[in-house]
């Protein structure tokens, strides 16, 4: 059976191959000097890490005491450690309250894997013996409700829907009322992801938060943004907009197995001080993994 680390390494191969081969080329029979450091800097920026993160890494890299003869594996080891340091704020666990309803507001643009991620989380917590409900608040997209229904059936969870085009906030409110009545442990709220009209969407999300606070002033327990690793630099804009609307508590990064831009995750964590709760490295339920910065950093450089 393939280990979690091996699966992660395999999933990050599109990014890591670029970085690993680039390092091999830069440091083939060359010493560490200004020229090779500049080439390394360019390579890391090309992997979608932000300029500020790469600058930090290079500055720290200069302080590392290397032997005169340096090989690419030594560079990769040092680089992995420095990337791990940049991710120091990323490993806050996704904690849940005991004996109380946990309301998880899940945001993300259409196509990011939001609905699928909710289905996987519902199944995962259902297998742990939790009572799970899902509120279908993307009421203007019938396909979203159908997709959610398939996942919720698999997870043996409760699906709470509204009429087509119903006010999403009213569906969220009713779902929360129903969850309290039925002693549900976790309520996932699936939201719309239409970014072509940002103001309406963000107002809709803000309204959902306002409405559920009427039933519990501490709700939501978590506001999570699902981001697609393939998106690259546009991820920064997404995090900024959704954070303004919902005060995000953390991120879930999907489709790492199909992205050559996984380096963007490092920059996003640094800029917004948000943890990464889970990462998606495949289609199966068990391919949604708790984020581990040490394994991620090593896999990113091809170790």
Swiss-Prot record:
InterPro entries: AAA+_ATPase (IPR003593), P-loop_NTPase (IPR027417), Signal_recog_particl_SRP54_hlx (IPR013822), SR_rcpt_FtsY (IPR004390), SRP/SRP_N (IPR036225), SRP54_GTPase_dom (IPR000897), SRP54_N_sf (IPR042101). It is found in: Cell inner membrane; Cytoplasm. GO terms for biological process: SRP-dependent cotranslational protein targeting to membrane. The keyword Cell wall biogenesis/degradation does not apply. GO terms for cellular component: cytoplasm; plasma membrane. Pfam families: SRP54, SRP54_N. It is a peripheral membrane protein. Keywords: Cell inner membrane, Cell membrane, Cytoplasm, GTP-binding, Hydrolase, Membrane, Nucleotide-binding, Receptor. The keyword Heme does not apply. It comes from the Bacteria. SMART domains: AAA, SRP54, SRP54_N. One of its GO terms (molecular function) is GTP binding. GTP binds at residues 108-115, 190-194, 254-257. PANTHER family: SIGNAL RECOGNITION PARTICLE RECEPTOR SUBUNIT ALPHA (PTHR43134:SF1). Involved in targeting and insertion of nascent membrane proteins into the cytoplasmic membrane. Acts as a receptor for the complex formed by the signal recognition particle (SRP) and the ribosome-nascent chain (RNC). Interaction with SRP-RNC leads to the transfer of the RNC complex to the Sec translocase for insertion into the membrane, the hydrolysis of GTP by both Ffh and FtsY, and the dissociation of the SRP-FtsY complex into the individual components. Part of the signal recognition particle protein translocation system, which is composed of SRP and FtsY. SRP is a ribonucleoprotein composed of Ffh and a 4.5S RNA molecule. HAMAP family: FtsY. NCBIfam families: ftsY. Belongs to the GTP-binding SRP family. FtsY subfamily. This is Signal recognition particle receptor FtsY.
């Amino acid at each position: 059976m393939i280990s979690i680390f091996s699966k992660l390494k395999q999933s990050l191969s599109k990014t890591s191959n670029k970085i690993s081969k680039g390092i091999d080329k830069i440091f083939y029979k060359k010493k560490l000097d200004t020229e090779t450091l500049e080439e390394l800097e360019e390579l890391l920026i090309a992997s979608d890490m932000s300029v500020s993160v790469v600058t930090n890494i290079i500055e720290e890299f200069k302080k590392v005491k290397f032997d005169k003869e340096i090989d690419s594996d030594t560079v990769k080891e040092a680089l992995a450690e420095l990337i791990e340091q940049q991710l120091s704020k990323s490993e806050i666990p996704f904690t849940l309250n005991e004996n109380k309803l946990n309301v998880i507001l899940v945001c993300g643009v259409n196509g990011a894997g939001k609905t699928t991620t909710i289905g996987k989380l519902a199944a995962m917590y259902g297998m742990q013996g939790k009572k799970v409900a899902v509120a279908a608040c993307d009421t203007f997209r019938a396909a979203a409700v159908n997709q959610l229904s398939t996942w919720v059936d698999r997870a043996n969870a409760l699906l709470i829907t509204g009429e087509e085009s119903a006010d999403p906030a009213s569906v969220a409110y009713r779902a929360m009322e129903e969850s309290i009545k039925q002693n549900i442990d976790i309520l996932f709220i699936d939201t719309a992801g239409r970014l072509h009209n940002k103001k309406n969407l963000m107002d809709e999300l803000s309204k959902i938060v306002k409405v559920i606070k009427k039933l519990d002033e501490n709700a939501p327990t978590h506001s999570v943004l699902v981001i697609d690793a393939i998106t690259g630099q546009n991820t920064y804009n997404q995090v900024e907009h959704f954070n303004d609307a919902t005060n995000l508590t953390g991120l879930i990064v999907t489709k790492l197995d199909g992205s050559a831009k996984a380096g963007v995750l490092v920059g996003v964590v640094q800029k917004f001080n948000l943890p990464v709760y889970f990462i998606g490295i495949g289609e199966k339920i068990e391919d949604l993994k708790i984020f581990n910065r040490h394994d991620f950093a090593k896999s990113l450089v091809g170790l």
